[in-house]
Amino acid sequence: MSKITKERLFEILNARHLNNPYSKLASIPSFNNFKDINIATKRVKQAILSGEKITIVGDYDVDGIVSTTIMLDFFNSLGIKVDYIIPNRFEHGYGLSVKIVDNIDSGLVITVDNGITAYEASLKLKEKNIDLIITDHHTVGDKIPIALAIINPKQKDCNFEFKEICGAQVAWYFCAAIKNEMNYDINMSSYLDLLCLAIIADIMPMTSLNYTMVRQGLKKIKNSSREAFKLLNSHLKKDILVSDDIGFTIAPKLNSAGRMDDASIALNFLLSKDQSSAYESLAVLDELNSYRKTIQERISNEAEQKSNKEDRAVVVWAEDWHEGIIGIVASKLSNSHKKPAFIFSIQNGIAKGSARANSNINLYDLISKASHLLLGFGGHKNAAGLSLLEENLPEFKEIINKEIEKADDILHDEFITLGELEVSIVVLVFISSIVSVEPYRLEHKRTVFKVSNANLVKSEIIG
């Protein structure tokens, strides 16, 4: 195994994004490449000019909260009042639903970070003669909602170059298109702090586009004029922010609102106009996050006890496991067992589940093999939500295990080391070289080294 020097490390790391054609915001792909975006912007223009009611429907995770924040901030900065609804996980379920539509009487509805699976809700809106614009980034299923426009890079006939972008990025591009249509004077780079937060929280791969947005966004957060980020910076007390600060500290705080209570708490925090309201919201988020950790530990232990090491996947369930926690537990067990994990909470005979897997497994395709058993499902390649009758859980588990057995050779990631590292060269300059090419995430993984003849003095679990 080759020895790694400071010079060699810097050379390897910088080569990863040496020829990035999108290293500047001015050179990123145009919003015009999205299917339906011109139809959508003209409809929004019509609504603005006629004073028509506009309702934004978001989602309760960080990406959905940030997507909603961007839309509200964008319209508010123009002096245009819009309504918004962020579904409560426990009252409404996920995204645009019939329950949500029951609360909308007229106007134009715009979804952010959801909507691509909302077929029944779209029918209800059509019955009410309410136009629907869907902005989403989740996988497109067979049953496409009825909408005036669908802005989603994962549509087969969408020409946008990058398919793996988060919901907030789609919403941001939509706002940029509206700005262009209406000739508004708004600096779209002012949203990079929010975009950075959403991209990392939603575990998007560090493609050339995402890398540029997050890299610039991390700097933007550090110098942000938003009261929320100013307060978070004062708590973190760091000169340089890295992706782990977002992924393991900031994002979990914000996610705790939608997981444990109501996502509007996190939304209000991001939209805070003064230090006092930001402080008040953050105090609630800290309390919810602390409660989340307690519940998470209990469910993780119970799920661990139910798992079978011989199975190809972790598929476990129990009555009344907290719905807001099972996604984190699935992620934790997927990492520790190095296999896909499906965690279900059963209430009144219905099993609602969250699934997580590493980058080699396509969960959406995997779950599709058992689609005949499901009441509904949706998500990404590596994260998904699903529901089915409790009585169908054993058969679902059997199908999942059989399907994964066919793909056993790609079941888990292996660590690939860059080389052997002498402990003596791990000094501030060396660490600075690693930090200098932040952010790290999928498709731009953190460097792994082999270290010989060293003793572990201290370890710490984060997140």
Predicted regions and their residues:
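A short, terminal or domain-edge coil/loop segment
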Residues: H137-I146, M260, I367-H372, E395-K406, ...
